[in-house]
Amino acid sequence: MNIRIGHGFDVHKFGGDSPLVLGGVTVPYDSGLIAHSDGDVVLHAISDAILGAMALGDIGKHFPDTDANFAGADSRVLLKHCYQLALQKQFVLGNLDVTIIAQAPKMAPHIEAIRQCLSADLQTDIDNINVKATTTENLGFTGRKEGIAVEAVVLMKSQ
């Protein structure tokens, strides 16, 4: 069996009046995230991790923010496209580990819904999906509640 590891990282700034969507789940909060697409920073980091594991570049290459076709794009559609590229290379998700870095909103009430959404979108058992959240103890831009950062690591295995 061939295995590959991918790492993804993304950051978005709070702003605007669009809803806050994280991992495909709408999370109640004062503000959404500023982005060319729907701003789902969780799905962007995961998409980058999958593309990285497959040596296919990053989401900016596949969905450039200069392309009006992707304005307001549903990040679940983008994630599914990235996963399809892995499937075409005969790779499936072994496991996924996501860290959401945010002072606010509190993520604990939303973690299981995010895991369920990711499990469905990535066609894998929920036991292969881990999502956790941490703060930066009021330090840096996330600590000042200016935005959210996410790291994602995937293990992809050949079929």
Curated annotation (Swiss-Prot):
<feature type="binding site">
    <location>
        <begin position="36"/>
        <end position="37"/>
    </location>
    <ligand>
        <name>4-CDP-2-C-methyl-D-erythritol 2-phosphate</name>
    </ligand>
</feature>
<comment type="subunit">
    <text>Homotrimer.</text>
</comment>
<dbReference type="InterPro" id="IPR020555">
    <property type="entry name" value="MECDP_synthase_CS"/>
</dbReference>
<feature type="binding site">
    <location>
        <begin position="63"/>
        <end position="67"/>
    </location>
    <ligand>
        <name>4-CDP-2-C-methyl-D-erythritol 2-phosphate</name>
    </ligand>
</feature>
<comment type="function">
    <text>Involved in the biosynthesis of isopentenyl diphosphate (IPP) and dimethylallyl diphosphate (DMAPP), two major building blocks of isoprenoid compounds. Catalyzes the conversion of 4-diphosphocytidyl-2-C-methyl-D-erythritol 2-phosphate (CDP-ME2P) to 2-C-methyl-D-erythritol 2,4-cyclodiphosphate (ME-CPP) with a corresponding release of cytidine 5-monophosphate (CMP).</text>
</comment>
<dbReference type="GO" id="GO:0019288">
    <property type="term" value="P:isopentenyl diphosphate biosynthetic process, methylerythritol 4-phosphate pathway"/>
</dbReference>
<feature type="binding site">
    <location>
        <position position="141"/>
    </location>
    <ligand>
        <name>4-CDP-2-C-methyl-D-erythritol 2-phosphate</name>
    </ligand>
</feature>
<feature type="binding site">
    <location>
        <begin position="58"/>
        <end position="60"/>
    </location>
    <ligand>
        <name>4-CDP-2-C-methyl-D-erythritol 2-phosphate</name>
    </ligand>
</feature>
<dbReference type="GO" id="GO:0008685">
    <property type="term" value="F:2-C-methyl-D-erythritol 2,4-cyclodiphosphate synthase activity"/>
</dbReference>
<feature type="binding site">
    <location>
        <begin position="134"/>
        <end position="137"/>
    </location>
    <ligand>
        <name>4-CDP-2-C-methyl-D-erythritol 2-phosphate</name>
    </ligand>
</feature>
<keyword id="KW-0479">Metal-binding</keyword>
<dbReference type="Pfam" id="PF02542">
    <property type="entry name" value="YgbB"/>
</dbReference>
<dbReference type="InterPro" id="IPR003526">
    <property type="entry name" value="MECDP_synthase"/>
</dbReference>
<feature type="binding site">
    <location>
        <position position="10"/>
    </location>
    <ligand>
        <name>a divalent metal cation</name>
    </ligand>
</feature>
<feature type="binding site">
    <location>
        <position position="44"/>
    </location>
    <ligand>
        <name>a divalent metal cation</name>
    </ligand>
</feature>
<feature type="binding site">
    <location>
        <begin position="102"/>
        <end position="108"/>
    </location>
    <ligand>
        <name>4-CDP-2-C-methyl-D-erythritol 2-phosphate</name>
    </ligand>
</feature>
<comment type="similarity">
    <text>Belongs to the IspF family.</text>
</comment>
<keyword id="KW-0456">Lyase</keyword>
<feature type="site" description="Transition state stabilizer">
    <location>
        <position position="36"/>
    </location>
</feature>
<dbReference type="GO" id="GO:0046872">
    <property type="term" value="F:metal ion binding"/>
</dbReference>
<feature type="binding site">
    <location>
        <position position="12"/>
    </location>
    <ligand>
        <name>a divalent metal cation</name>
    </ligand>
</feature>
<feature type="binding site">
    <location>
        <begin position="10"/>
        <end position="12"/>
    </location>
    <ligand>
        <name>4-CDP-2-C-methyl-D-erythritol 2-phosphate</name>
    </ligand>
</feature>
<comment type="pathway">
    <text>Isoprenoid biosynthesis; isopentenyl diphosphate biosynthesis via DXP pathway; isopentenyl diphosphate from 1-deoxy-D-xylulose 5-phosphate: step 4/6.</text>
</comment>
<dbReference type="GO" id="GO:0016114">
    <property type="term" value="P:terpenoid biosynthetic process"/>
</dbReference>
<protein>
    <recommendedName>
        <fullName>2-C-methyl-D-erythritol 2,4-cyclodiphosphate synthase</fullName>
        <ecNumber>4.6.1.12</ecNumber>
    </recommendedName>
</protein>
<keyword id="KW-0414">Isoprene biosynthesis</keyword>
<feature type="binding site">
    <location>
        <position position="144"/>
    </location>
    <ligand>
        <name>4-CDP-2-C-methyl-D-erythritol 2-phosphate</name>
    </ligand>
</feature>
<feature type="site" description="Transition state stabilizer">
    <location>
        <position position="135"/>
    </location>
</feature>
<dbReference type="InterPro" id="IPR036571">
    <property type="entry name" value="MECDP_synthase_sf"/>
</dbReference>
